[in-house]
Amino acid sequence: MSLLIRGATIVTHDESYRADVYCADGVIKAIGENLDIPAGAEVLDGSGQYLMPGGIDPHTHMQTPFMGTVASEDFYSGTAAGLAGGTTSIIDFVIPNPQQSLLEAFHQWRGWAEKSASDYGFHVAITWWSEQVREEMAELVSHHGINSFKHFMAYKNAIMAADDTLVASFERCLELGAVPTVHAENGELVYHLQRKLMAQGITGPEAHPLSRPSQVEGEAASRAIRIAETIGTPLYLVHVSTKEALDEITYARSKGQPVYGEVLAGHLLLDDSVYQHPDWQTAAGYVMSPPFRPRGHQDALWHGLQSGNLHTTATDHCCFCAEQKAAGRDDFSKIPPGTAGIEDRMAVLWDEGVNSGRLSMQDFVALTSTNTAKIFNLYPRKGAIRVGADADLVLWDPQGTRTISAKTHHQQVDFNIFEGKTVTGVPSHTVSQGRVVWADGDLRAERGAGRYIERPAYPAVFDLLSKRAEQHKPTAVKR
């Protein structure tokens, strides 16, 4: 199978230029003009369009068991929806139950993901600590291509990682060359505020953001960053949603600390007024953690992207239908938190970022693809347009439009947080492994076509930190 994309303007994270791209055997074989290609190659006309690396979503939760139910989007439907939106790879999460073997959970998630329509990888969550966990982390890194571990600082009495677990796991990540990531919310404070609001009779979705104010995220971000600084490991903060958390990242980076921030498309656009909707079901549809924030935080997050202190855009794609959300009808803390977005992320970011002048096209590529590939050691196999890279590409029509709606999206959920928004700039074609899987509204996703992509431990940042540590190595005082 071979494919020639002709006439498009190639846009990468650092340049744009006119050239044709020839793909065969799932990879990019040649880039240039007037390419000599074999007869019979499929030809796409990219005139007037941009050819960019396929999107990589570093934060999804397909088919996740949580709060007594299971996310409505499975690995096939979710990755297929991603292809319709220009996303050609995801990094999902293995979340072991407390006391469950990490390896057992990993193989369980691998089995679920075999139906994926696009390439995928995993972060593995550390939900408890023991010598077994410590050893299995090494097994996952050395034999299963895991180079990042997730820590939930929220969800008390469930999967929350207390400080002793953070310290032990961060230390182990440093030894293994794996990146620790954190969901930064103070779980003790959230639990306290949830009970307090319930006692006051505030039981609806409007209580959700009140139980998780911006200070809760700011404190946890600060704590995680300080722990990482003390131990000497890099740190990646998922779904940064507040100015307070961004300020902590910015300060740490100003001192040379390798801290990376991720922002969700929804947090860039929506504010907490959505929880005041008079219809309970609609308000509950927006419940996710961290919640959408008061006005002002959105501008701060855009500035974080522009300044380089936020590095990736994601979705935290975790779908629960209205019937599932109804479990919290009388207690907001029992509403399964999660929203969709994998199909919409790239178009929303283009419309609100590039079209508004907030971001350049090169910024867009970096934030939707290349930076994730670099941070999690997928680059240049992913996130790049160069000979030898995977032929995961999106042909982008800057004049194309789409009105987002749950009635027409491909995501397996009955709600869309961007409902009714018309975006300008959409994928006309998506290419995965050199095969056209989305063509002008025709979704050609294939169940099981996705591959598990191993991500080896990443030495670059860790070598740097090791040199720093050696220079400041403490010594005993001779007496």
Report residues per predicted region.
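Histidine-rich, glycine-flanked metal-binding segment
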Residues: 1-53
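Intein/HINT protein-splicing elements and their conserved insertion hotspots or analogous self-processing inserts
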Residues: 440-479
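Metal-associated gating/positioning segment near the N- to mid-region
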Residues: 46-115, 132
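A glycine-rich helix N-cap at a beta->alpha junction
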Residues: 111-126
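His/Asp/Glu-enriched, well-ordered alpha-helical/loop segment
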Residues: 206-234, 285-286, 306-313, 319-399
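Histidine/acidic residue-rich metal-binding segments in metalloenzymes
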Residues: 135-313, 318
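Divalent metal-coordination and catalytic microenvironments
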Residues: 8, 26, 48, 59, ...
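C-terminal cap of metal-dependent C-N hydrolases
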Residues: 327-331, 387-453
